Amino acid sequence: MTANAQQLQFIKDSIETIPDYPKPGVLFRDITTLLDNPLAYQATIDLLVERYQGKGITKIVGTEARGFLFGAPVALRLGVGFIPVRKAGKLPRETLSETYNLEYGTDTLEMHKDSVRENDKVLVIDDLLATGGTVEATVRLIRRLGGEVSEAAFIIGLLGLGGVERLQRQGVSSFTLLEFPDH
């Protein structure tokens, strides 16, 4: 097993699976146990930094709230700015908004209008890719400001829920450290 494969297995083992949460039949992947393990958390950040070092990234965008936990330390290590994308009404300056569909309704994300500039090369980081609705709205915000989305990175990808395909339809490549079945 390579060093990276060992790190990935260590990270995967640090994520607890909670059956029947938030509803029966769902296996919830709980990253709080990864965050509580400083060695696993550090290994996660290290692998992301290793992947994106020297790739010309100028900004990292993290989506509320768990995207902040991974995006900000990677941005710090890469020496680039970190941009939070938040739920509507949480940012103090002038914002752009994108509304997207959820299973039972809609939600709205916002980012500051001056956070991404024309030709910024942006990496989106979030904890989990499932259906891809949140990241799709985030990509639309970045593009409306003139930024180029270089890739979207996730700690966990849930297979079979269509998130990767949704990003591909937008012309965005994705990267996941770990993949789990969708159930």
From Swiss-Prot:
<dbReference type="GO" id="GO:0044209">
    <property type="term" value="P:AMP salvage"/>
</dbReference>
<dbReference type="GO" id="GO:0005737">
    <property type="term" value="C:cytoplasm"/>
</dbReference>
<comment type="similarity">
    <text>Belongs to the purine/pyrimidine phosphoribosyltransferase family.</text>
</comment>
<dbReference type="Pfam" id="PF00156">
    <property type="entry name" value="Pribosyltran"/>
</dbReference>
<dbReference type="GO" id="GO:0006166">
    <property type="term" value="P:purine ribonucleoside salvage"/>
</dbReference>
<keyword id="KW-0808">Transferase</keyword>
<comment type="pathway">
    <text>Purine metabolism; AMP biosynthesis via salvage pathway; AMP from adenine: step 1/1.</text>
</comment>
<dbReference type="GO" id="GO:0006168">
    <property type="term" value="P:adenine salvage"/>
</dbReference>
<keyword id="KW-0963">Cytoplasm</keyword>
<dbReference type="InterPro" id="IPR050054">
    <property type="entry name" value="UPRTase/APRTase"/>
</dbReference>
<dbReference type="GO" id="GO:0003999">
    <property type="term" value="F:adenine phosphoribosyltransferase activity"/>
</dbReference>
<dbReference type="InterPro" id="IPR029057">
    <property type="entry name" value="PRTase-like"/>
</dbReference>
<comment type="subunit">
    <text>Homodimer.</text>
</comment>
<dbReference type="GO" id="GO:0002055">
    <property type="term" value="F:adenine binding"/>
</dbReference>
<dbReference type="GO" id="GO:0016208">
    <property type="term" value="F:AMP binding"/>
</dbReference>
<dbReference type="InterPro" id="IPR005764">
    <property type="entry name" value="Ade_phspho_trans"/>
</dbReference>
<dbReference type="InterPro" id="IPR000836">
    <property type="entry name" value="PRibTrfase_dom"/>
</dbReference>
<keyword id="KW-0660">Purine salvage</keyword>
<protein>
    <recommendedName>
        <fullName>Adenine phosphoribosyltransferase</fullName>
        <ecNumber>2.4.2.7</ecNumber>
    </recommendedName>
</protein>
<comment type="function">
    <text>Catalyzes a salvage reaction resulting in the formation of AMP, that is energically less costly than de novo synthesis.</text>
</comment>
<keyword id="KW-0328">Glycosyltransferase</keyword>
